[in-house]
A protein has these predicted regions:
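Structural marker of alpha-solenoid helical repeat scaffolds
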Residues: 2-4, 36-37, 71, 105, ...
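Canonical positions in the second alpha-helix
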Residues: 1, 33-34, 67-68, 101-102, ...
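Structural register within alpha-helical repeat arrays
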Residues: 14-17, 47-48, 82, 116, ...
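Short coil/linker segments at helix-helix boundaries
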Residues: 122-167
Length: 195
């Protein structure tokens, strides 16, 4: 077993060198020559994912992180990297789902909590702004229209701001982030205004 492990380490080292010498050929070698159910295959695909992430080729990095996750679907660092690639590819909704999966596995994951906290905060800001703009268009609002506006604001606070607050509070438990603290202060101030 020790010999096999040393041999796998050596194979991974050679594979890493091959990637540096020619990533396209090494990638082709992976797809056509590597036995996908071999013990070393996940390590090789992880090398390709890491290489493409470093080179900022987010599409290929994403592809290889997804491939790696076929082997280790609950690997938190790989899920976080996959979510980063989804963001870089403009797939916010996919990143959202991936970060939510990360938090199911590791509730204190800093990156996932920061992303989700900021995502829901920005979503809440956008929804609040739209409600305010729509309400301002009404020249003389009736009580019913005002009540609808207040209910809409209340929903935004309960849902999006509430979620943002939960995630950002977790961030502060793990890491003293000034930005998360400032955002929480803004949410608190708005909550007081709404009451």
């Amino acid at each position: 077993a020790r010999l096999a492990s040393d041999l796998d380490d050596y194979v991974v080292s050679l594979f890493r060198q091959a990637i540096a010498a020619g990533a396209d050929q090494t990638e082709m070698y992976y797809w056509t020559q590597i036995e996908k159910n071999s013990a070393v295959a996940p390590r090789l695909v992880n090398e390709l994912a890491t290489y493409y992430k470093r080179k900022r080729n987010y599409d290929k990095a994403y592809l290889f992180y997804r491939e790696f996750l076929q082997y280790h679907s609950e690997d938190v660092p790989a899920l976080v990297s996959c979510a980063e690639m989804e963001m870089m590819r403009g797939k916010e909704k996919d990143a959202l789902k991936t970060y939510e999966k990360v938090l199911m596995l590791d509730a204190d994951n800093l990156q996932a909590n920061i992303f989700l906290g900021n995502y829901y905060y920005l979503q809440a800001e956008k929804d609040k702004k739209k409600l305010e703009e729509d309400y301002k268009k009404i020249t003389s609002p009736t009580r019913m229209q005002y009540a609808r506006y207040r209910n809409g604001l209340s929903d935004v606070f309960t849902n999006s701001y509430g979620k943002a607050k939960t995630y950002l509070q977790r961030v502060l438990q793990v890491f003293p982030s000034m930005e998360a603290g400032n955002t929480l202060e803004k949410i608190k101030k708005m909550e007081l205004e709404l009451k």
